[in-house]
A protein has these predicted regions:
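Short, structured active-site-proximal loop/turn typified by the sulfatase FGly-forming signature C/S-X-P-X-R
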Residues: 43-91, 148-152
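Bacterial Sec-dependent N-terminal signal peptides
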Residues: 1-25
Length: 252
């Protein structure tokens, strides 16, 4: 997999102080998968990071400088499946976000599954096309199903492939109405998420959301082409695709 289509950072969070012995089994495992974050960007923009975020991970964590997977032209789905399974697409089966279904001669999403209904969406989804286990599945095995596994992502393929076969829930943004949605394949769609959708989801707030640089444009020294043209995007100004564009932005 060429130079960082997706950067994935595994964070193991332990209770207690650093001076205390670490437990043999972590209580919390958090995986952050950032689409399109090239590895060299981590260094290029390091001066803009806070001390407790990426800087701490790179300073105190394990950093692999030559991590590659032997396949070409990755996209979001194939890369996510590879990161979570440790296998190439020829083994885990997710060759792309979409492919041609030879039986119907129509495009098929990699997590499309008519056997399950959607929550807050008309999309039918499951990880049935994923042919291997994932780190999420192995966590359920290691804890004898006592561990809880949830995946949250802007797009359904990323959420479903991250949650794996045994996850408790996978949630993503409905690009039509801005609600968090899911699939009946997974056993849980929490009541608090229902309440959030009914009162506080992004469709109630999108008119007030504006995408702008966090810092002064002049501080982004590696983006010289943009330094004379301030970037500002108002999502409400686009009637049809505003939730899709919000999901593809860093603000989600």
């Amino acid at each position: 997999m060429k130079k960082g289509l997706i950067t994935s950072i595994l964070v193991l969070t332990f209770g207690g102080l650093q001076a205390q012995p670490l437990p043999s089994t972590p209580k919390l495992v958090v995986t952050l998968t950032i689409d399109q974050l090239r590895t060299d960007y981590l260094e290029a923009f390091s001066a803009l990071y806070g001390e407790k975020g990426f800087k701490r991970l790179m300073r105190e964590g394990k950093v692999y400088m030559q991590a590659e997977m032997p396949f070409d032209k990755p996209d979001r789905a194939s890369a996510t499946a590879t990161l979570f399974s440790g296998c190439s697409p020829s083994t885990h089966g997710i060759i792309a976000t979409k492919w041609m279904d030879v039986s119907t001669l129509t495009p098929r999403n990699c997590v499309e599954d008519p056997n399950f209904m959607g929550n807050y969406t008309n999309q039918n989804s499951s990880p049935a096309q994923l042919l291997t286990s994932t780190i999420a599945d192995e966590l359920k095995v290691a804890t004898r199903n006592a561990g809880k596994v949830y995946a949250i992502a802007p797009f359904r393929d990323a959420a479903v492939l991250s949650a794996g076969h045994a996850g408790d829930g996978a949630f993503w943004i409905n690009k039509t109405n801005g609600k968090w949605c899911g699939s009946t394949y997974y056993p849980e769609f929490p009541e608090w998420l229902n309440q959030y959708n009914d009162s506080s989801s992004v469709d109630f707030r999108i008119k007030d959301i504006t995408w702008m640089p966090l810092h002064q444009v002049s501080s982004y020294k590696y983006l010289s082409d943009w330094r004379t043209e301030p970037f500002k995007y108002i999502f409400e100004s686009e009637r049809e695709n505003k939730f899709y564009r919000l999901a593809a932005s860093p603000l989600i």
